[in-house]
Design a protein with these regions (language model features):
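Short, flexible active-site loop motifs that bind/organize anionic cofactors or intermediates
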Residues: 13-16, 39, 59
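A beta-strand edge to alpha-helix "cap/lid" segment located at domain peripheries
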Residues: 3, 50-120
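A short gly/proline-enriched turn/hairpin at secondary-structure junctions
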Residues: 33-44
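Short glycine/serine/threonine-biased micro-segments
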Residues: 19, 43, 78
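Short, well-structured alpha-helical segments
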Residues: 27, 46, 50-53
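Glycine-centered loop/turn positions within well-structured domains
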Residues: 24, 32, 109
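Short, low-complexity N-terminal intrinsically disordered segments enriched in polar/charged residues
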Residues: 1-29, 120
Length: 120
């Protein structure tokens, strides 16, 4: 039997804030010098992250339903079913994205969001 590890508290807080469309609460989960990479675009620091959150998370009413959590050598990998009002061109009906979180001092320092496809 495989057990799913519990989410790190700041990741749980982050996902709850995303699902509540709470811009300030989402940004508060990041370190001041954090990096977000989403769709091959980099957002460095909370000012840039706030703009991304306002437009693409809160603005598009994104929600995430966690489907899998894996701890991997200090990194937390969260797969989730994404929904919202974003452009779905060339995306599957059920969109599963993989989120790679790195946490330091109870803050997100790196979040990489990737649409993975099967290797074979």
């Amino acid at each position: 039997m495989t057990m799913t590890p519990a989410l790190n508290p700041v990741i749980a807080e982050h996902l709850a804030a995303v699902n509540a469309h709470d811009e300030d609460a989402i940004v508060a989960t990041f370190a001041a010098d954090a990096l977000v990479n989403d769709a091959h675009r980099e957002f460095w620091g909370t000012d840039a992250i706030r703009r991304w959150v306002a437009k693409e998370m809160v603005g598009d009413k994104v929600t995430v339903e966690v489907t899998e959590v894996t701890d991997h050598h200090g990194q937390t990998i969260v797969r989730g079913r994404y929904d919202g009002l974003f452009d779905r061109s060339n995306l599957p009906d059920e969109l599963i994205l993989t989120n790679y979180f790195t946490i330091r001092d109870a803050k997100i320092v790196t979040l990489i969001v990737i649409y993975n496809t099967p290797a074979y």
